């Protein structure tokens, strides 16, 4: 999801005012905000997640939304920056199977530079201007909105810069036998 893609989507969607923030104070709020953002996305999302635990993008409802996005047609793209993709593979995270089946749509990269590997925050960005930001990815305390492009912009810039400095996560690629 490049800056151009986001702006193209915004012009197609009729960019409106920012929506009120969603509460993110505990695990329940976090799961609800994540699902609402995934449901509101049309074709593209970007996820920065240091580590994937079972309760992060692993629920049946979240996977259904991720599958819907991945199969939404032309322009569908799920970009994920993950610090340790091997850990998610070893733990059989449910997102791995989706990424392997749809490897041209679900793009996974891993940071190479120390500055990126030290980044402890996580976020989800949608093509509708939505975002979920956790300053500490290990804690369920952050902020979110279904549409707030002004708040999303610095996160999108950070994601795009990190994406360029990252390498393709080959551990998740399906084996061609």
Model regions and ranges:
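PLD/PLD-like phosphodiesterase catalytic module centered on the HKD motif
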Residues: 1-46, 51-177
